[in-house]
Design a protein with these regions (language model features):
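N-terminal beta-strand motif that seeds the catalytic metal site of vicinal oxygen chelate
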Residues: 1-26, 74-76, 123-125
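Short, low-complexity Ser/Thr-rich regulatory SLiMs
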Residues: 42, 64-66, 124
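Core segments of cupin and vicinal oxygen chelate
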Residues: 9, 16-59
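Vicinal oxygen chelate
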Residues: 1-8, 12-20, 49, 51-54, 62, 65-125
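A short beta-turn/loop motif at secondary-structure boundaries
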Residues: 43-46, 68, 103-104
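A short alpha-helix capping/helix-coil boundary motif
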Residues: 3-7, 28-30, 64-68
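Short alpha-helix boundary/capping motifs
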Residues: 57-59, 81, 118-119
Length: 125
């Protein structure tokens, strides 16, 4: 990969999630993590074919599930300024607890499962 070219603003590896109700996933990430919408292509008036958000300097791509493209979930690890605050925002936006905030050897960490079945490991140091 000596001549690898990556478009500006992207990483070499990026998660690509297929979720049910991608528009609600977009709102969840904005409300909980401060995500910024970068791109959105609609399949129909209500279904997202492809979308991208930025959280910090990272990109997550996602789309609505279809009969051809089944739901694909992920476990995501995210550093935040305040684990407890983001954890509470997640719960307020429909997430459930995987692990309540607790001090760990690597920082303060919590786990939530969002309404789309993705697990987010939230950590502040």
């Amino acid at each position: 990969m000596e001549n690898l070219k990556i478009p500006e603003g992207y990483q070499q590896i990026m998660p690509y999630l297929i979720v049910e109700n991608a528009a609600e996933f977009l709102n969840f990430t904005k409300n909980v993590f401060g995500a910024v919408e970068r791109h959105k292509t609609m399949r129909t008036e209500t279904l997202i074919m492809h979308a991208e958000i930025s959280i910090g300097n990272c990109v997550i791509m996602f789309a609505d599930a279809t009969p051809e493209h089944h739901k694909q979930n992920a476990g995501l690890f995210i550093y935040v300024d305040n684990c407890d605050t983001v954890y509470e925002k997640g719960l307020a936006n429909g997430a459930t607890t995987v692990m309540p905030p607790a001090d760990q050897s690597y920082g303060r960490s919590a786990g939530i499962r969002d309404p789309f079945d993705n697990t987010w490991w939230i950590t502040s140091v």
